[in-house]
């Protein structure tokens, strides 16, 4: 175990500075198209929405981040394509949109047919899970800019205007249904890599909680895609949705100005216990960085909560309160 408390900011990712950069980038984005293609939401939600007649088109863009560096270490790239799809699709699902098409962007230091084939394998698998088509993309060879590779993509979805879910219906007393993650997913990997480095571990060594796999393989488990959320939307009165990704539970603030009280949270998986122990990371930093076992959240009336939990393999984890974000007695914000 590392003697000092490792943090995301110390590893090089300062969320507050990142938010400042985003604000500086978007402050001047004032032009808005009218008619078909007019924006229906402001910048800052999980996905952007534009007018398309009876429907709203939804767009999200995201990448795999520094998880690709672990794929390089393991020389196994057939799962990061799933991650790329998942990060975008889950953001569309978080506003109630169904994914319909995808384009990818792959930036390379150098060409390799085996590498490219594995990337494509993951993208195809992710698209199949998401029931959508990959309709194009861009591959750029940038040896002076890229060390290794970077993978990102943009996803297009659609939803009837009256069925958009952006959190306005969330009310005091609404119930929180959490859906489990299957690992770290695709956020917080700068801190993950720092923990592995500082604790003296190797990605190729056995994972202490399951010696049938390695640390690297455990960290490369692809991000879960939550397509079952669309079925819940059809059968339940869903008031709000959240994809638990970067900044952990902090991103819940974009859903509603009300608070979240997680009285019975999903138990974090062994990979989170390992990272916390080896990195000497405190509870607050863990919940502000990682999904901590819960990859998606559904907010809905108590009458529909059990049904939603049953449909997704999730559980009731808490309720909407007046303010704050709490996990048991831990104040997140």
Curated annotation (Swiss-Prot):
Entry's Gene Ontology BP terms: 'de novo' IMP biosynthetic process; adenine biosynthetic process
Keyword Nucleotide-binding: yes
Enzyme class: ligase
Pathway membership, UniProt: Purine metabolism; IMP biosynthesis via de novo pathway; 5-amino-1-(5-phospho-D-ribosyl)imidazole from N(2)-formyl-N(1)-(5-phospho-D-ribosyl)glycinamide: step 2/2
Compartments where located: Cytoplasm
Record keywords, A-Z: ATP-binding, Cytoplasm, Ligase, Nucleotide-binding, Purine biosynthesis
Segments forming a coiled coil: none
InterPro entries attached to this UniProt entry: PurM-like_C_dom, PurM-like_C_sf, PurM-like_N, PurM-like_N_sf, PurM_cligase
Record-linked SUPFAM superfamilies: PurM C-terminal domain-like, PurM N-terminal domain-like
Catalytic reactions on record: 2-formamido-N(1)-(5-O-phospho-beta-D-ribosyl)acetamidine + ATP = 5-amino-1-(5-phospho-beta-D-ribosyl)imidazole + ADP + phosphate + H(+)
UniProt GO molecular function: ATP binding; phosphoribosylamine-glycine ligase activity; phosphoribosylformylglycinamidine cyclo-ligase activity
Entry GO terms, CC: cytosol
Enzyme nomenclature, EC number: 6.3.3.1
NCBIfam families: purM
UniProt family annotation: Belongs to the AIR synthase family.
Protein name according to UniProt: Phosphoribosylformylglycinamidine cyclo-ligase
Originating organism: Methanococcoides burtonii (strain DSM 6242 / NBRC 107633 / OCM 468 / ACE-M)
């Amino acid at each position: 175990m590392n003697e000092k408390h490792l943090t995301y900011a110390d590893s090089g990712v300062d969320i507050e500075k990142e938010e400042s950069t985003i604000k500086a980038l978007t402050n001047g984005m004032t032009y808005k198209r009218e008619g078909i293609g007019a924006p229906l939401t402001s910048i800052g939600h999980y996905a952007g929405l534009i007018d398309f007649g009876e429907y709203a088109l939804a767009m999200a863009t995201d990448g795999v981040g520094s998880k690709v560096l672990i794929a390089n270490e393991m020389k196994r790239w057939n799962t990061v394509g799933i991650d790329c799809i998942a990060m975008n699709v889950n953001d569309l699902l978080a506003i109630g949109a169904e994914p319909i098409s995808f384009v990818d962007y792959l930036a390379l230091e150098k060409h390799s047919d085996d590498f490219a084939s594995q990337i494509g394998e993951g993208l195809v698998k992710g698209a199949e899970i998401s029931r959508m088509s990959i309709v194009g993309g861009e591959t750029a060879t940038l040896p002076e800019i890229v060390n290794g590779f970077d993978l990102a993509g943009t996803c297009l979805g659609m939803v009837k205007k009256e069925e958009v879910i952006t959190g306005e219906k969330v009310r005091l007393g609404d119930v929180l249904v959490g859906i489990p993650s299957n690992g770290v997913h695709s956020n917080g990997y700068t801190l993950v890599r720092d923990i592995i480095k500082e604790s003296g571990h190797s990605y190729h060594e056995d994972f202490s909680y399951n010696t049938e796999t390695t640390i690297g393989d455990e960290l490369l488990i692809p991000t879960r895609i939550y397509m079952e959320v669309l079925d819940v939307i059809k059968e339940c009165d869903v008031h709000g949705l959240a994809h638990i990704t970067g900044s952990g539970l902090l991103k819940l603030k974009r859903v509603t100005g009300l608070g979240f009280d997680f009285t019975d949270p999903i138990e974090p998986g062994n990979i989170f216990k390992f990272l916390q122990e080896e990195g000497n990371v405190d509870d607050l930093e863990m919940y502000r960085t990682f999904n901590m076992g819960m990859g998606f959240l559904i907010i809905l009336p108590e009458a529909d909560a059990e049904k939603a939990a049953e449909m997704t393999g999730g559980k009731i984890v808490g309720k909407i309160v007046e303010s704050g974000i709490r996990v048991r007695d831990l104040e997140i914000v």
